[in-house]
Amino acid sequence: MMMKINNYELFLYLVMIAYSMVGCAGNSICINLNEKKIVSKEGDIVRFEIEENDTSYYFLLKGKVRHQKTVDLKDIYNNNRVDESFRFGKMNSFSLKPRSTYIFTNRTVYDATPASLKFYTDSVGNLHSLDNRICE
């Protein structure tokens, strides 16, 4: 028995095949503990937020079309291309504090669910992942 495929179904199948071949820019991220960086596995990082305790800090990176795939957590303002007009007040640097818990959220892609990554710093300042999404 042969199935009849109408034009709409054929178009849908072609779109799905093209979408799977090209891929999409998602918000999937992981953490590189040695280099203290957040790495985007899919797409670029443009907008992100870091939550520390009950305070959220929002960041926007410079660029028109392409941005960076990593965010250096050692000093976010000085080691990344942060948009100057998007700084918080007179804050010149943003560094991670020892013995603190953080949530990094990639909010770059509008139609994708924001991806969050939880990590903490120990007393020496080393990073540790709380949800085991570590880059290899």
Language model feature labels by segment:
Residues 1-24:
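Sec-dependent bacterial lipoprotein signal peptides
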Residues 18, 53, 64, 107, ...:
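Short linear sequence elements within intrinsically disordered, low-complexity coil regions
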Residues 23-60, 114-136:
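N-terminal non-catalytic regions of secreted/periplasmic and cell-surface proteins
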Residues 52-82:
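N-terminal, post-signal-peptide region of Sec/Tat-exported proteins
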Residues 71-101:
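Signal that preferentially marks extracellular ectodomain short beta-strand elements
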Residues 103-105:
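Extracellular recognition modules
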Residues 107-115:
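Short acidic/polar inter-strand loop motif in beta-rich domains
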